[in-house]
Amino acid sequence: MSNVEKKISQLQQQLNQYNHEYYVLDQPSVPDAEYDRLMTALIDLEKTNPELKTIDSPSQKVGGQALKSFTQVTHQLPMLSLDNVFSLDDFHAFVKRVKDRLNDNQAIVFCAEPKLDGLAVSLRYEHGQLIQAATRGDGSVGENITTNIRTIKSIPLKLMGTPGKDFPDIVEVRGEVFMPKASFDALNTLAKKRGEKGFANPRNAAAGSLRQLDSKITAKRNLAFYAYSLGFVGKLSDGGAESTDLTNDFFANSHHERLCQLKRLGLPMCPEVRLLESEQACDAFYQDILAKRSALSYEIDGTVLKVDEISLQKRLGFVARAPRWAIAYKFPAEEELTCVEDVEFQVGRTGAITPVARLKPVFVGGVTVSNATLHNQDEITRLGLKVNDFVVIRRAGDVIPQIVSVVLDKRPDNAVDIVFPTSCPVCDSAVAKPEGEAVLRCTAGLFCAAQRKEAIKHFASRKAHDVDGLGDKLVEQLVDEKLINTPADLFKLTEIQVSTIDRMGKKSATNLINGLEQAKSTTLAKFIYGLGIREVGEATAANLANHFYTLAAIESASLEDLQNVSDVGEVVAKNIINFFKEEHNLAIVSGLSEVMHWPTIEIKSAEELPLAEQIFVLTGTLTQMGRTEAKTALQSLGAKVSGSVSKNTHFVVAGDKAGSKLTKAQDLGISVLTEDGLVALLAEHGITI
């Protein structure tokens, strides 16, 4: 098995596990950003190695698996998820993509609904009788929960109307099962009285109730249901086989009207559903639902906006896991009040000393939050924060806890000023605040254990050398055991040394040594990035490699030489020069370059570099190629790929969900390429995607 096959297999296993935790167990163990990072890595690898992509890859799934305690049901039509946006600009970008794809300038009418926070299910009616119900599962295969669904009072066991006239033999209805707030409160009150553990939120309660093997328990949970779409609609032959799709024969060409038809058949429809004729009306609907969110009898976490005309939906089609004609416009992060019990100081890879607030645990945005970063002294001054203050905490982007403000009216008598350390809290070395920076830094460099650990973690990270078997915890153990002090020391480790580490058996030790051996083969760009030079990210490292071609040329480059590189200004150039001035850094670089190797970068002629000196910025999601593939293709033609838009940018490539970079490009009058435009440009120069 090749290294690429191993990596793809490893990513698939990880993502399958995380899908299982999130969709089946309702116990996610990693943040969304980490999941997205792994999914992007898998998609990129499968894009460049299509022969290794399997039909059961997580990249082809919506998420989750059927529980083994229930029989499995295969959905005739997949139950897809929705893409998300979090801002008005992103919603407008979605509408623009819809209009661009339709390319006929007609007004778009949307069907708008609250985004219910429950569990997606599919109900199958045959000859008007409810004969089967299933969860979404992984989108293709779900759990058979028919017995439990039949206990929900709002779901009809028999459709109203006349079979053959009002509906065909088979009607599949998709919708959301949820637990009303009042039912949730009553359930948890009862659990408390019994000394039992309650549910964290109504969604978990609904999911747990539907997965009861004893339907009598489900019946007591007072679940509810709203229909939101159709699944397969067709005819049964005498032998029971399903025939062609009859949806258009019985249901309207309007999504909204189809919901009304389902309501007439006896299926409940969310009362807040609206038909809207402009983007402005969609935003007003969003604001209205957000304002009345707390007053609704059920939990929601945003709005769903769908192109109403079914024929347009068919023209727009789908991407792998979601329709192009619908979007979930999510609400901002939730906020709660809590108390700052203490402030501790952490030391990062570059010596930055970051204050972290230790909070009285508070439940916000669906999780318990006990820590929040305070960034730097300026942020603390801006907030006017003291230890023991009451603060408003927000989960920014529903991921990162953030202190929004101090509630001065509730400031206690024992509020204490936050005092920054005068020496490093880890190694006790001197600290300094570089001119023009807001961050206090430890001056000890790799002498500081905290910086050593973070530098080695960075070196081994996926974007750098992706050392298989070397996680953050193991790095900390290796440093604490004094087995390594620098990234170069990694390559001196032996299996015997590693196997002495707690919880590291012979197999794990062998895997790590093999992973380090594989990491010796790299690229100059990854080598530079892995050194962890301040403010030298992936794009800048690649630009340095493609500009200077060799490590020696980068080491000896002058300030002026460095500033001739795309994305390198005076500050970054000085950081690079200062890095290579330090003797201990040079020793590490020398040690690494002795054991690591990379292909020579060929110096191409001007004819071979038709995009020389052209600066490109990639934004949004590319569906025909991965970002890495696009970046590599552009760089092979001489282009510089930058991470930010400026007046010097020549082209911005805007994929799906392009955000602020696209807006800035439009403001600056910079040429914008769609993904199709990029594919065409590359094809002009002999690169076929």
Curated annotation (Swiss-Prot):
Domain BRCT: 606-689
Cofactor dependency: Mg(2+); Mn(2+)
Pfam family, one: HHH_5
Keywords for this protein: DNA damage, DNA repair, DNA replication, Ligase, Magnesium, Manganese, Metal-binding, NAD, Zinc
Reaction equations catalysed: NAD(+) + (deoxyribonucleotide)n-3'-hydroxyl + 5'-phospho-(deoxyribonucleotide)m = (deoxyribonucleotide)n+m + AMP + beta-nicotinamide D-nucleotide
GO terms, molecular function: DNA binding; DNA ligase (NAD+) activity; metal ion binding
Stored InterPro entries: BRCT_dom (IPR001357), BRCT_dom_sf (IPR036420), DisA/LigA_HHH (IPR041663), DNA_ligase (IPR001679), DNA_ligase_AS (IPR018239), DNA_ligase_CS (IPR033136), DNAligase_adenylation (IPR013839), DNAligase_N (IPR013840)
GO CC aspect terms: cytosol
Record-listed NAD(+) binding positions: 32-36, 81-82, 113, 136, 176, 306, 330
Catalytic center residues: 115 (n6-amp-lysine intermediate)
TM annotation in the entry: none
Gene3D superfamilies: 5' to 3' exonuclease, C-terminal subdomain, 6.20.10.30, BRCT domain, DNA ligase/mRNA capping enzyme, Helix hairpin bin, Nucleic acid-binding proteins
PANTHER family for this protein: CHROMOSOME TRANSMISSION FIDELITY FACTOR 18 (PTHR23389), DNA LIGASE (PTHR23389:SF9)
Family of this protein: Belongs to the NAD-dependent DNA ligase family. LigA subfamily.
Protein name: DNA ligase
Species lineage: Bacteria, Pseudomonadati, Pseudomonadota, Gammaproteobacteria, Alteromonadales
Chain's gene name: ligA
